[in-house]
Amino acid sequence: MTSNQITIALTKGRIEKDAVTLLEKAGFNMSFMADKGRNLIFESPDNRFRFLLVKAPDVTTYVRHGVADIGIVGKDVLVEHPTGYLEMLDLNFGLCKFCVASTEDYNPNDHKRKRIATKYPTIATDYFNQKGEDVEIISIQGSVEIAPVIGLADAIVDIVETGSTLVANGLKVYEDICRISARMIVNKASLKNNKEVLQFIRKIESLVGNEEVPFE
């Protein structure tokens, strides 16, 4: 690894694929990642870049500890893990939204104390606090869609892309919370000490056409 090599942590899966496409549009040759196999670490032939394929929640950890200079990850992860990095760009892919969803008999205007199941306790808590509603948050790591169906919760807060999974489980969206997309984050020291990092970010910024978009 060269001293100015940029290490980028990518969220495995759809965000990874969209990120590679974006980098190709920016003029970078990404063919070395075409045949990944089971590999999780890739270096570009010119040694300018090293890519780490990791799970979404780990992207912020790698960037925070300086193992990665840059991370590409969904805004949902940043909301739950908000410190230790700088958020630089909204990349305008990986588009989806946070929603409140439940069964047909759910009444969002019922003022009784609700139980809300979610994999995103921070966003759920903040949302209902802003509404002035007292709710019990139930953290679930697996398939949250079944929680209202089996009576564990009154409703869920989850990420919705097409809504097909909700429909398949007898749920519908009652409230939209906020839009989510892939974001570029950077290690603070890397931004300060490695000029290649800032040049890379500015090159991507010229394609996506924005600076940091605050969370709404």
Curated annotation (Swiss-Prot):
It is an enzyme of class 2 (transferase). Keywords: Amino-acid biosynthesis, ATP-binding, Cytoplasm, Glycosyltransferase, Histidine biosynthesis, Nucleotide-binding, Transferase. Its main location: cytoplasm. GO terms for molecular function: ATP binding; ATP phosphoribosyltransferase activity. Its EC number is 2.4.2.17. Pfam families: HisG. It catalyses: 1-(5-phospho-beta-D-ribosyl)-ATP + diphosphate = 5-phospho-alpha-D-ribose 1-diphosphate + ATP. GO terms for cellular component: cytoplasm. It is found in: Cytoplasm. GO terms for biological process: L-histidine biosynthetic process. Pathway: Amino-acid biosynthesis; L-histidine biosynthesis; L-histidine from 5-phospho-alpha-D-ribose 1-diphosphate: step 1/9. The keyword Aminoacyl-tRNA synthetase does not apply. Belongs to the ATP phosphoribosyltransferase family. Short subfamily. Catalyzes the condensation of ATP and 5-phosphoribose 1-diphosphate to form N'-(5'-phosphoribosyl)-ATP (PR-ATP). Has a crucial role in the pathway because the rate of histidine biosynthesis seems to be controlled primarily by regulation of HisG enzymatic activity. Heteromultimer composed of HisG and HisZ subunits. Lacks the C-terminal regulatory region which is replaced by HisZ. NCBIfam families: hisG. This is ATP phosphoribosyltransferase. It comes from Streptococcus thermophilus (strain ATCC BAA-491 / LMD-9). The gene is hisG.
